Amino acid sequence: TDLKKVEEGTQLLLGDIKSEKELEIQVEFHENVPLTIARNGDHLHITCQEPAHYYRGLNWAVLHPEDTWNTKSEPVYFSKNGVMLDCSRNAVFTVEKVKSFIRIMAKLGMNTLMLYTEETYTVPDEPYFGAYRGRYSQDEIREMDAYAKTFGIELVPCIQTLAHLHNALKWPLGETVKDTADILQVGKEEVYTLIEKMLCSVKESFSTNRVHLGMDEAAHLGLGKYLRENGYTKSSVLIREHSARVFEICKKLGLEPMIWSDMYITANTGGSYYDVADDTDCSDWEKPDPELGLVYWDYYNPDQEIYEKMIRVHQQLSNKVIFAGGSWIWNGISPNYSKT
């Protein structure tokens, strides 16, 4: 643990909280321990696993100065816990806004921030990629990345390497690589040249080796230019072939990829994402590389049994399963707490 960064983050966080109370703070980092805050007058002793947990403890202690407590302890349930910021709808968050969000995350003890940028980041030699959309420069991403590391937060690129690319493919670059208006054409070499450029930009901008490749909701995969040039191929085969090609590029660049999982479910079953039988056997399914992370996203279902079923299915498909829930802010001007 970089204690200089912890000290820097402490000063930034205390300034953000606007605490005027003088505190003497001692922190210890150990493996596999709960977050524990002990108070003796103006002395705080915080024991935890990592900086993100420390900042959560510090924030709690500063916000409860008059409460009658001496020790507070809470277990750590997840090794990685955080949020994804959508920087692809309309425009991106400014760098300063992302920094303010990072400070909020630090107060909550989160250690992962995914930056969802479909094409709102810079790809060298592709001037129309993210044009007029407020795309981040590589230096802006590096600035946010360094700031996040101050608080023990990993900034993770979350991009798109198959679908959801309408705003990129509407430009001339799309003519040689698109299958349909927003989907890349599987198997075309120009596609993988472009994806390697994307991933090289990501590698140069972010300090993490983890990358989210997207690949969700490609409902018309293989049904556009691909169909005219190659004939019909099952979408389950196309998603496996495409993810394998992109996974090889990631290995070449030393990146650890993950993708949204819905195409591997829907392409194999022919049904909807969550319409999977309880006793589903995935042994004869088209599967990704076992080391490719699968992100199970579920923003809708109210029943625990559905989540348990879907997790069982995912564990048959990948050794690395990540869960993504949703804070419902997309159906009105205020959060929908009943659905979150």
Question: What are the language-model segments listed below?
Answer:
Residues S205-S207, H220-T340:
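Catalytic-core regions of glycoside hydrolase
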Residues D2, V33, A91, Y300-D303:
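Short acidic, S/G/P-rich loop/turn micro-motifs used as interaction or catalytic elements
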Residues T1-K72, I259-T266, G270-Y274, D279-T280:
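Acidic, contiguous N-terminal accessory segments
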Residues K18-E20, H30, R39, V76-F78, ...:
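A generic structural signal for short, non-catalytic loop/turn and secondary-structure boundary residues
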Residues D2, V6-G9, K97, E140, ...:
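Residue-level preference for nonpolar/small residues embedded in alpha-helices
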Residues L23-I25, H43-L44, N81-G82, L292-G293, ...:
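Structural motif
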Residues N40-M258, F323-G325:
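Feature activates predominantly on carbohydrate-active enzymes
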